[in-house]
């Protein structure tokens, strides 16, 4: 299918040497990165205004609905863009870049249609708007990721910080400064329509420019065979280098920076616009100006960080930049009025920290990655950043609606502090770089503590907010309504159930056998959040009143589906230890734990029936469960799923 838009300037199979990489190609790359990030930024920045004015989403649901749309877009994008990253090692980066622009064109065209449906029928256009956001996110992210990989192909260790810094500079310029200028049109008649037309025009121009002007550098790799599966190689590289483990942990929070700020700062401005006496279009434009200041800080800081990482440890650079951004987020969360121009100060701190972390991650990943799997390595970094975006946007949406518009920023700050502590732990244990950027120690670091801390984050966030709001002193969850706590815990229980269910297929497809040692931990965290979900319903919502609970179950019978799933989950949790496996016997234990398939199906149905009609997230989760259950059924029937799903 990709043959139809083979670049006219040369076939990927022949390749181009870095010395032959013309200056005009650099200009094209920088321009394409700018417009690719602009498409992503415009789609996020305009979203809160569209949901409020066009689709008529109620104020009390705005945070959750905005977050749900972003989460759905990120989940689909993770799968698609990750696959494109693997594929690019074999067919070249340029064809994938052209494909990304075409996907963005399709999304932009649908956005104009969803706008008309929204104007005519209100929330009825949301389904199409979900699809629009998915396509725009997949297209824009594909373009940006593959351009970064292409620069990695042509750069060397000596010039990589400079070239990657230039690329990040242009990406931030398009995603913040240029976006902020264009978003000012939202306050004028017809401005929203013009803003929505721009991604369509950009996509068409970007596709044509890619075909006409870009050429591949790296030689295409042969399809993997046997033990050479690229995902297995990616895993081996990451697990053998503590710097990459830190980099991927930092990517979990760093990629979400611009999305979190663009989305929730805009929502914050819109939510208080009536109180300060300004229109909502003005509030959207004001938010864009502040995000533009953030971008200005990033642009100004990139040369400084580029010089720093050329001369100092990248581990120190990641720790310093994360801590700076963390302080900025927490400071931002202390402001009561987003129209106070002093909020620019914490935004500048976040921008400076984001610049250092993002540039360091790009340079470090390309430096350490073997050339044959560079696309897969960059895609793996995107995958981790996408998962972080899903978790942070999902939690941020809940916190925005239930606890107030500043809560998502506190969330980001505390998470970045956690990774900063991990960087400090590495340095304290002698795991650092020499002056020429080689590891001083070959000591390997176990991932279990990092996986545990990441899985515990949703609970830590909830407890931390409860302490801040005085739960333990006054016996209530502060400002947090019980419904928020209940849904929050239930969503995370289901998230970890799906992750646990997916680990065996991923292990079988990629051959990464070491994933098995994390499956039990993930499954127990699913049970942990399920227990908290049930306890919140029984105690916080109904105060152990059995009569009221029975009446509620009669009105909402889908609760029985969740209860049945929880009862099935209990024996699985209590038989997960090695001693219980030996006591029961391996075959009987496997038969018992097949109940996880039924549990996931029950929870998916429970989630769909419990959600409101504006929420598309349950259907994405249910689709994931269907795919995973199909995989197990097909394997049970003797089908060769591995051959069908392996890249190559």
Swiss-Prot record:
Residue span of region Major facilitator domain: 1-431
Subcellular location per the Swiss-Prot or TrEMBL entry: Magnetosome membrane
GO BP, sorted A to Z: iron ion transport; protein repair
Region Ferric reductase-like domain, required for correct magnetite crystal formation, residue ranges: 444-645
InterPro entries: Fe3_Rdtase_TM_dom, MFS, MFS_dom, MFS_trans_sf, MsrQ-like
Transmembrane segments: 28-49, 69-87, 94-113, 119-143, 163-182, 188-207, 252-273, 285-305, 317-335, 341-361, 373-395, 407-428, 449-468, 488-506, 518-538, 558-574, 595-612, 618-634
Consequence of gene loss (knockout): Slightly reduced magnetic response, produces chains of wild-type magnetite crystals sandwiched between irregularly shaped, small flake-like crystals. The flake-like crystals are hematite not magnetite. Phenotype is exacerbated when grown in NH(4)(+) instead of NO(3)(-) medium. Double mamH-mamZ deletion cells have a poor magnetic response and very few wild-type crystals; most cells have flake-like crystals.
GO molecular function: electron transfer activity; FMN binding; heme binding; oxidoreductase activity, acting on diphenols and related substances as donors; transmembrane transporter activity
Induction description: Expressed in exponential phase, peaks about 18 hours. The most highly expressed gene in this operon. Protein is associated with magnetosomes at mid-development then decreases (at protein level). Third gene in the 4 gene mamXY operon.
Keyword Transport among record annotations: yes
Keyword Membrane annotated: yes
Main subcellular location of this protein, as a coarse class: membrane
Bilayer topology term: Multi-pass membrane protein
Pfam families registered for this protein in UniProt: Ferric_reduct, MFS_1
Superkingdom, natural source: Bacteria
Role of this protein: Required for correct biomineralization of the magnetosome; probably converts and then transports some form of iron. It is partially functionally redundant with MamH. May function with MamX, MamY amd Mms6 in biomineralization. Despite its strong similarity to MsrQ (AC V6EX82) this protein does not genetically interact with bona fide MsrP (AC V6F0A4), which is encoded elsewhere in the genome.
Family of the protein in this entry: In the N-terminal section; belongs to the major facilitator superfamily.
Domain notes: Deletion of the C-terminal 'ferric reductase' domain (residues 444-645) phenocopies the deletion mutant; makes a magnetosome with normal crystals sandwiched between flake-like crystals.
Subunit note: Probably interacts with FtsZ-like and MamY proteins.
Stated name of the protein: Magnetosome protein MamZ
């Amino acid at each position: 299918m990709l043959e139809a838009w083979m670049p006219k300037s040369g076939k990927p199979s022949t390749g181009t040497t870095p010395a032959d990489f013309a200056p005009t190609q650099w200009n094209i790359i920088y321009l394409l990165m700018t417009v690719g990030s602009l498409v992503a930024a415009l789609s996020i920045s305009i979203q809160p205004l569209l949901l409020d004015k066009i689709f008529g989403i109620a104020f009390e649901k705005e945070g959750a609905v905005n977050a749900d749309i972003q989460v759905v877009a990120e989940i689909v994008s993770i799968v698609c863009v990750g696959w494109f990253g693997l594929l690019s090692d074999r067919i070249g980066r340029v064809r994938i870049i052209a494909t990304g622009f075409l996907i963005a064109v399709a999304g932009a065209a649908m956005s104009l249609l969803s706008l008309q449906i929204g104007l005519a029928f209100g929330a009825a256009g949301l389904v199409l708007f979900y699809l629009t956001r998915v396509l725009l996110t997949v297209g824009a992210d594909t373009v940006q990721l593959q351009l970064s990989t292409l620069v990695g192909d042509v750069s060397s260790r000596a010039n990589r910080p400079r070239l990657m810094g230039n690329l990040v500079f242009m990406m931030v310029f398009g995603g913040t400064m240029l976006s902020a200028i264009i978003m000012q049109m939202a306050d004028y008649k017809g401005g929203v329509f013009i803003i929505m037309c721009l991604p369509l025009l950009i996509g068409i121009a970007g596709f044509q420019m890619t075909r006409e002007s870009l050429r591949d550098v790296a030689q295409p790799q042969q399809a993997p065979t046997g033990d050479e599966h690229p995902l297995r190689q990616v895993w081996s590289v990451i697990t053998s280098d503590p710097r990459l483990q830190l980099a991927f942990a930092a990517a979990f929070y760093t990629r979400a920076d611009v999305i979190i700020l663009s989305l929730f700062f805009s929502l914050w401005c819109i939510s208080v616009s009536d109180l300060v006496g300004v229109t909502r279009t003005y509030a959207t434009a004001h938010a864009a100006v502040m995000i533009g200041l953030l971008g200005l800080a990033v642009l100004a800081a990139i040369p400084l960080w580029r010089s720093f990482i050329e001369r100092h440890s990248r581990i120190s650079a990641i720790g310093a930049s994360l801590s700076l951004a963390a302080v900025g987020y927490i400071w931002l969360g202390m402001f009561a009025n987003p129209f106070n121009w002093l909020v620019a100060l914490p935004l500048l701190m976040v921008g400076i920290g984001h610049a250092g972390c993002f540039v360091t991650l790009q340079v470090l990943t390309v430096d350490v990655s073997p050339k044959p799997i560079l696309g897969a390595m960059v895609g793996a970094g995107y995958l981790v950043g996408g998962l972080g975006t899903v978790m942070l946007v999902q939690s941020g949406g809940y916190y925005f609606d239930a606890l107030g518009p500043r809560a998502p920023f506190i969330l980001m700050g505390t998470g970045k502090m956690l990774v900063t502590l991990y960087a400090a732990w590495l340095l304290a244990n002698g795991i650092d770089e020499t002056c020429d950027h080689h590891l001083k120690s070959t000591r390997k670091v176990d991932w279990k503590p990092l996986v545990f801390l990441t899985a515990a984050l949703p609970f830590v966030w909830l407890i931390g907010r409860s302490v801040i709001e005085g739960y333990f002193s006054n016996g209530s969850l502060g400002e947090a309504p019980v419904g928020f706590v209940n849904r929050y815990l239930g969503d995370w229980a289901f998230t970890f159930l799906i992750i646990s269910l997916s680990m065996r297929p991923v292990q079988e497809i990629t051959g990464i056998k070491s994933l098995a040692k994390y499956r039990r931990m993930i499954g127990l965290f699913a049970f942990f959040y399920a227990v908290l979900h049930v306890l919140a319903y029984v105690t916080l919502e109904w105060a152990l009143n059995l009569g009221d609970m029975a009446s509620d179950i009669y009105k909402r019978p889908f609760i029985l589906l969740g209860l049945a799933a929880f009862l099935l989950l209990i024996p699985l949790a209590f038989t997960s230890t090695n001693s219980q496996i030996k006591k029961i016997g391996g075959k009987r234990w496997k038969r018992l734990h097949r109940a996880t398939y039924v549990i996931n199906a029950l929870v998916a149905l429970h989630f769909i029936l419990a959600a409101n009609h504006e929420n598309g997230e349950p259907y994405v989760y249910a689709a994931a469960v269907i795919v995973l259950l199909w995989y197990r059924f097909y394997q049970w029937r003797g089908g060769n799923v591995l051959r069908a799903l392996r890249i190559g």
